[in-house]
Design a protein with these regions (language model features):
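P-loop NTPase motor domains
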Residues: 64, 105-399, 414, 424, ...
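Intrinsically disordered, low-complexity N-terminal regions enriched in serine/proline/glycine
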Residues: 29, 44, 78-79, 86-87, ...
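Short alpha-helical interface patches
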Residues: 17-23, 41-44, 50-87, 182-192, ...
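A broad, low-specificity signal for short, low-complexity segments enriched in glycine/proline
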Residues: 69-76, 86, 91-101, 121-122, ...
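Conserved ATP-driven motor cores of ASCE-family P-loop NTPases powering translocation/secretion/packaging/pilus
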Residues: 391-493
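Compositionally biased amphipathic helical and low-complexity segments enriched in hydrophobic
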Residues: 15-19, 89-91, 405, 479, ...
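Basic- and hydrophobic-enriched, low-structure N-terminal and domain-boundary segments
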Residues: 1-117, 121-124, 449, 460, ...
Length: 572
């Protein structure tokens, strides 16, 4: 450019000279004006660079108002499904392996769905039919047990039923069996108090609960250390409470229970049971009577003969769930919640027992994974802090939970300000549909906002009329609360930590490979009360047989003894 510069050049000539210089960029020569032109163009270049750098902004074209989008369920299934191991069935096209170490997620799943949304049919029953691990199943109305029991027996499961609908036929559960030291007694009593305290209780004075706790700790510690195993149960606790008489007008009166602890103190002055009983005895006569009445009312269910028998011994064998395939069904009535705290105690002691087995016997991880399928979770009385702590740590022990609720309002009522902690401890969230407004709003916010292109048209009429079209970017919810409410009943929304949400069809129970072995597939319903090898199961009619005379089959000499038990009966 310096070679073509001449003093007095007009702008048109200057542009022509610039074009010719650009046409021959390598025709270089050093002239007297070269330093001046080099300086000018260097300054211009520096100005352009400075303006460009200072004008840069953090722009995300197409995501100005949000980047939410739907994920691909088939791509997710390819990553999370365990092709060689057992899986959980979440939707028709998405399965997730129960071994969280492979996909780096826990398998705690929160399932939300209103009445009739298919919580049991599209999630609960299909995952029981998988027969992938040991299971503890909360089963309102015993529906899952009736449908799947026969299949589980065929697959080699031991089916155990804790039945609060029909306690007379239930397997027995004795909480004392799972108490191994004094510390666990304190934990059991704390959980019992929490489980039997109404969730909406507004008592501001903790005195009564603490006094009840001290008395119950004294009684249970006494039984643990002094009573034979057959007397270590809540029926005996109620007997001891009945023996704890208090006379308000006689401070020197000693009840049979007072004498019992007095004799223990003579033998063992440092007994922890005596220490806790002394705390209770510090209460004045009228106060002590109120404490006894309060404890008696709290544990009144154990005075019922059916419940006393139910908790007299133990047949659940919780420690075996992580060692072989066991299906423990906790059948609860859907119209009466008064005894549901027993199920809460089972879950609490189950977690403690499995943790002990994993840590002390199996080097930190159970050989058989355990799935806690908590249908109608709101009806289970579980201590809030204990369960949240377990939910955060159970993955490493091969334990996982499926928490099924009808709406988010239930969680908020149960956990108050901590409900989001429970949601955060579940890496998968499955929404099946419902009618509760707050749930619609929560799901909509969880989906996020997307950026869309909008076009607006403006037209003004008249003598000076005009017409314009305006294109712009705006944001909207991926699904508005109203769109969440209108979700197709055959579809569901699945959230996975770190992944985009997906919409997919709910799992079709009738397409499960094991459906023919269930009641839905035409098989007979399972009846756990029917005894194996009962008279009705014999292949022959008893009326066709007669009992022989004793002389016909008893040997006269010891050498003639043979295994001929079949000769007791013979056809007529």
């Amino acid at each position: 450019m310096a070679c073509r510069w001449q003093p007095g050049m007009k702008i048109t000539a200057l542009l022509d000279a610039l074009n010719s210089a650009l046409a021959e960029p390598f025709a270089l020569a050093w002239v007297s004006d070269s330093p001046r032109f080099l300086l000018v163009f260097t300054v211009i270049y520096a100005v352009v660079v400075i303006v460009t750098v200072t004008d840069q902004k953090n722009t995300r074209p197409g995501a100005e108002h949000g980047s939410a989008a739907w994920g691909d369920v088939f791509r997710l299934n390819k990553f999370y499904m365990d092709k060689r191991g057992p899986n959980l069935l979440l939707t028709q096209h998405f399965h997730i392996g129960i071994d969280g170490y492979k996909h780096k997620h826990n398998t705690n799943i929160l399932i939300v769905g209103g009445s009739g949304a298919g919580k049991t049919r599209t999630y609960g029953v299909p995952n029981v039919l998988e027969c992938a691990c040991s299971m503890v199943i909360t089963d309102p109305k015993a529906e899952i047990l009736r449908k799947t029991g026969n299949l589980l027996k065929q697959k080699g499961y031991e089916v155990i039923v804790f039945d609060l609908i029909n306690p007379a036929a239930s397997f027995c559960y004795n909480p004392f069996v799972y108490v191994h030291d004094d510390r666990e007694v304190l934990t059991l009593i704390e959980n019992l108090i929490q489980n039997t305290t109404p969730s909406h209780s507004k008592s501001s004075d903790p005195f009564w609960e603490k006094s009840e706790t001290a008395l119950l700790q004294a009684l249970m510690l006494y039984l643990l250390h002094e009573a034979p195993p057959e007397e270590q149960n809540f029926s005996m606790v109620m007997e001891m409470i009945a023996a704890a008489e208090v006379h308000e007008d006689d401070d020197n009166y000693q009840s049979p229970l007072d004498i019992l602890f007095e004799r223990l103190e003579m033998r063992e002055p440092d007994s922890i049971a005596c220490k806790q009983y002394r705390i209770f005895k510090q209460a004045a006569g009228k106060t002590a009577k109120s404490i006894l009445v309060s404890v008696g009312v709290r544990l009144a269910a154990f005075n019922l003969p059916s419940i006393a028998k139910l908790t007299m011994t133990d047949e659940l064998h919780l420690q075996e769930l992580g060692e072989r395939k066991v299906a423990l069904f906790c059948c609860i009535p859907d119209s009466d919640k008064s005894l549901n705290y027993l199920v809460g105690m089972i879950y609490t002691q189950l977690i403690q027992t499995l943790y002990r087995q994993a840590d002390r016997v199996h080097k930190g991880r159970l050989p058989v994974p355990v799935h806690c399928l908590m249908d109608e979770y709101a009806n289970i009385s579980l201590p809030k802090d204990t369960f949240l702590s377990a939910l955060a740590t159970m993955r490493s022990r091969a334990i996982f939970c499926s928490i099924i609720v009808q709406n988010m309002a239930q969680l908020k009522a149960m956990y108050k300000d901590d409900w989001e902690s429970l949601v955060g401890l579940c890496d998968e969230f499955l929404y099946l549909g419902g009618t509760e407004k707050e749930t619609h709003k929560y799901v909509s916010e969880l989906l996020g906002k997307e950026t869309i292109s909008t076009t607006s048209y403006n037209q003004s009429k008249g003598r000076s009329g005009s017409y314009s079209i305006n294109h712009q970017q705006s944001g909207r919810d991926l699904m508005t609360p109203d769109e969440v409410r209108l979700l197709d009943n055959s579809k569901c929304i699945l959230f996975i930590r770190g992944e985009r949400p997906v919409v997919d069809y709910k799992y079709n129970l009738l397409k499960h490979p094991n459906i023919r072995c269930t009641e839905d597939g035409g098989a007979a319903p399972y009846d756990y009360t029917a005894a194996d090898n009962a008279l009705d199961d014999l292949p022959c009619a008893p009326e066709n047989y007669e009992l022989l005379d004793m002389d016909d089959f008893l040997p006269t000499e010891p050498a003639e003894i043979k295994p001929t038990i079949q000769r007791i009966r013979r056809p007529k």
